[in-house]
Amino acid sequence: NYDNAYPILKKYGFKGTVFVVTSFLGTRKGYLTWDGCREMEKNGMTVASHTVDHKSMTDLTDDQLRAELVESKKKAEAELGHEVKYMAYPTGAYNLHIAQLVREAGYKAAFTIKYGGVSRKSNIYALERVPIFHTEKTNRDFVERIHYTPQFESFGWTKH
């Protein structure tokens, strides 16, 4: 994210969100660091939680879930100096009980890996996204999304 996507987003004035696994930051060469997170935030990016260890949440006990959610949020808030409002489910695995624990941990919303849009009726703890996957059509998909952004905005489908 920091080496590839961030410079392009910064160059063109786009904003984005990076979901961080707090125990991974700065642990290996090439991994994002907290300094990198702070720099990205200064340039309009949002840093959000992806738990402590990126474990599939449906495999964890309630105590383990709470630890993953709360400790990740606390660590990110301490490093960034502000509230961390959002999280993304590792591997996309969640259920309504897990979503409730996310809410109880203090997050304002959570993101799935399900492909789709968001409306006022969407469950804010199970928000769908429109990903850009690395495929032979990645560049074309990205260019089309940029090209059609004005139309999406006119329908109220985007917010920045």
Residues of each region from the PLM?
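C-terminal active-site subregion of NodB/CE4 polysaccharide deacetylases
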Residues: 1-4, 42, 59-160
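Active-site beta->alpha N-cap acidic-glycine motif
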Residues: 1-43
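A short alpha-helix capping/helix-coil boundary motif
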Residues: 14-18, 52-53, 76-80
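A cross-domain feature marking catalytic cores of carbohydrate-active enzymes
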Residues: 18-22, 49-51, 88-91, 129-131
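Short histidine/acidic/glycine/proline-rich micro-motifs that form metal-
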Residues: 23-27, 56, 90-93
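Append "and occasionally in soluble cytosolic enzymes with long acidic Gly/Pro-rich linkers
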Residues: 37-41, 48, 74
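Substrate-binding clefts and substrate-entry loops adjacent to catalytic sites
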Residues: 48-63
